[in-house]
């Protein structure tokens, strides 16, 4: 279950209902998908083959189709980041630059953890700490950045309206 940390006052929201209500008020889509159907050989696997990626996409094809139909998304892929990722530190420096997109930024966490820092409607930033099973959609034109948690690894399904709209605007 995702948790929230509000930067300026270092307040945490950990209760499931309170997290959902907070994100709903910020117009951030949050869903919890059933991660238990992920087979053991794909759990915490950060060296995915093309076949592994296709298997993950197939496992979650109904959920991807549902959210895509509801929200107008048209494309998806998988990203895997870990200590084995070439230039991981350089990638994380880029990811941590505050930016926005002209489309939603949608991620479903398959393995590992990630943090989206999002600028709230009041101008304050808050972290959404994500774990396997969490889906988040940062609305278009909302300032944010992404980083990893202490384990420095994540596998995520990325879902797009268009890949062109996903280009960051710094």
Curated annotation (Swiss-Prot):
Keyword annotations from UniProtKB, A to Z: Amino-acid biosynthesis, Dioxygenase, Iron, Metal-binding, Methionine biosynthesis, Nickel, Oxidoreductase
Cofactor binding summary note: Binds 1 Fe(2+) cation per monomer. Binds 1 nickel ion per monomer.
GO molecular-function term, one example from the UniProt record: acireductone dioxygenase (Ni2+-requiring) activity
Family that this chain belongs to: Belongs to the acireductone dioxygenase (ARD) family.
EC number(s) from the headed UniProt entry: 1.13.11.54, 1.13.11.53
Annotated pathway: Amino-acid biosynthesis; L-methionine biosynthesis via salvage pathway; L-methionine from S-methyl-5-thio-alpha-D-ribose 1-phosphate: step 5/6
Important to generate the dianion, annotated site positions: 107
Record's subunit section: Monomer.
Task of the protein: Catalyzes 2 different reactions between oxygen and the acireductone 1,2-dihydroxy-3-keto-5-methylthiopentene (DHK-MTPene) depending upon the metal bound in the active site. Fe-containing acireductone dioxygenase (Fe-ARD) produces formate and 2-keto-4-methylthiobutyrate (KMTB), the alpha-ketoacid precursor of methionine in the methionine recycle pathway. Ni-containing acireductone dioxygenase (Ni-ARD) produces methylthiopropionate, carbon monoxide and formate, and does not lie on the methionine recycle pathway.
Protein name: Acireductone dioxygenase
Residues binding Ni(2+), per UniProt: 99, 101, 105, 144
Origin species: Bacillus cytotoxicus (strain DSM 22905 / CIP 110041 / 391-98 / NVH 391-98)
EC main group: oxidoreductase
């Amino acid at each position: 279950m995702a948790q929230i940390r509000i930067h300026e006052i270092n307040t945490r929201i950990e209760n499931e209902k309170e997290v959902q209500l907070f994100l709903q008020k910020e117009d951030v889509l949050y869903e919890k998908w059933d991660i238990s159907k992920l087979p053991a050989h794909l759990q915490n696997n950060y060296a995915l083959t093309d076949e592994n990626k296709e298997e993950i996409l197939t496992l979650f094809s109904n959920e991807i189709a549902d959210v895509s139909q509801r929200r107008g998304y048209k494309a998806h892929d998988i990203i895997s980041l870990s200590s084995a990722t070439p230039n991981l530190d350089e990638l994380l420096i880029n990811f941590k630059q505050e930016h926005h997109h002209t489309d939603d930024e949608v991620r479903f966490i398959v393995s590992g953890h990630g943090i989206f820092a999002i600028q709230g409607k009041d101008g304050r930033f808050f972290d959404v700490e994500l774990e396997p099973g969490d889906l988040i959609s940062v609305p278009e034109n909302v300032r944010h950045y992404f980083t990893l948690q202490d384990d420095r690894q994540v596998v995520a399904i990325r879902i797009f309206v268009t890949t062109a709209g996903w280009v960051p605007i710094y």
